[in-house]
UniProtKB/Swiss-Prot annotation:
It comes from the Bacteria. The keyword Transferase does not apply. It comes from Bacillus subtilis (strain 168). It holds the Pfam family AI-2E_transport. Its main location: membrane. The chain crosses the membrane at residues 20-40, 47-67, 86-106, 175-195, 237-257, 262-282, 286-306, 331-351. The keyword Membrane applies. This is Putative transport protein YubA.
């Protein structure tokens, strides 16, 4: 028995207390996982199809759950039974949606139709400005210097435009399929949300039933931290996006920018995605401002700068704080990579997914430090009474 324990201890020290061996072991495990996945990817096809089917309803349900659950908890603390609180909240939400559809949607529809009607005028303005630019000495000099043939360039642009139009018609079927999926998801969300609001608190207890007794406390800590990170991010990001949309709406009204309501709604929706969202949001506003006048473009830049300063210095620090502890460069790389791999869904899930993975990885690394002797010096430094 002692011999077995001795060999077990040597084996453990060999893998856990040797940085080089541990590094090779991690590389080996990663390589094996990649190899197995590439050779058996067909096995995961049904799972991927299932995940694609249920991902959108689950994402929408999770977002709405984190928004409404604090309200249900508040009503329950006021001695209103939870199921009655949920039903009351459903009635309020249905009322708000009805008011929005009746009052706001027609106004936005009017602005959208007006924008569509004015597109030919905008095209004419851009075309005239382009002709003036092409006829200027600056462009002629640039053409001679860079050896660019404007006619050939226009022909290539025309051919590319025709290709885009053809691909657009080809993608109509895909658009209809995606629209059907969205409608089905919206219909199923209220039912999933009801049971999640009603029994969501029992979910950690149910998960802990499958966890060994000695790991229950640590697992519960991990689940609680994951829940805190997700709830803080989702609620905070939506509130910040709403504030940005409202501030831009006020600013657009002050400077007299056309389609202020529509542009503010676009800004509020896209601002859910950090860093990249504001860039997408300002693009249509810049186009309309350029077509209007150079002075309007200057006013737009001033309004946008003021709103970004208010958001960065006042709103986000108060609402978001430093809950996720993710560096801005990391966020940008996450958004670019997830967008390339998984599209819009990847952009939306990149940051909360990374936050969850970071919580799990941090706790696993803490467990490893407790098991390994590689970090004994660090543990001694963190011990109470240790003097530096």
């Amino acid at each position: 028995m002692e011999t077995l324990q001795t060999w077990s201890g040597r084996f453990k020290r060999f893998f856990l207390d040797n940085k080089f061996v541990l590094f090779l072991l991690v590389l080996l495990l990663i390589g094996l996982n990649i190899l197995v996945f590439t050779k058996t990817s067909f096995i995961f096809t049904p799972i991927i199809v299932l995940l694609k089917t249920i991902s959108l309803p689950i994402i929408l349900t999770g977002i709405v759950f984190y928004l409404l659950n604090p309200v249900v908890d508040f009503l329950e603390r006021r001695r209103i039974r939870r199921i009655y609180s949920i039903l009351l909240l459903y009635l309020l939400v249905i009322g708000l949606i009805t008011i929005t559809i009746v009052s706001i949607i027609p106004f936005l529809k009017e602005q959208i139709m007006s924008l569509i009607d004015n597109i030919p005028r905008y095209v004419d303005v851009v075309e005239n400005q382009t002709k003036q630019l092409i006829g200027s000495n600056f462009v002629n000099q640039a053409q001679q210097t860079m050896n660019i043939n404007i006619s050939d360039l226009a022909t290539k642009v025309s051919d590319q435009a025709a290709t885009i139009v053809n691909s657009t018609f080809t993608g109509v079927g895909n658009f209809i399929g995606a629209l059907t999926e969205i409608i089905i998801s919206i219909v199923t969300v209220p039912f999933i949300l009801f049971y999640l609001l009603k029994d969501g608190r029992k979910l950690p207890v149910y998960i802990l039933k499958f966890v060994p007794t000695r790991l229950k406390e640590q697992t519960y800590t991990v689940l609680s931290e994951m829940n805190h990170r997700l709830s803080s991010y989702i609620r905070g990001q939506i509130i910040v996006s709403f504030c940005i949309g409202f501030l831009l709406f006020i600013g657009y009204l002050i400077i007299g920018l056309d389609y202020a309501s529509l542009l503010a709604v676009i800004a509020a929706c896209t601002s859910i995605v950090p860093y990249l969202g504001p860039t997408i949001a300002i693009t249509p506003a810049i186009i309309i401002a350029i077509v209007t006048s150079p002075l309007m473009l200057l006013k737009l830049v001033i309004v946008w700068t003021i709103v970004q300063l208010i958001e960065g210095k006042l709103i986000s620090p108060q609402i978001m704080g430093k809950n996720l502890h993710i560096h801005p460069i990391t966020i940008i790389f996450l958004l670019l990579t997830a967008g390339k791999l998984f599209g819009v869904v990847g952009i939306i899930l990149a940051i909360p997914g990374y936050a969850v993975a970071k919580v799990i990885t941090t706790h696993l690394f803490d467990w490893f430090k407790m098991q390994s002797h590689l970090y004994d010096e660090e543990k001694n430094e963190n011990t109470p009474g240790h003097k530096v």
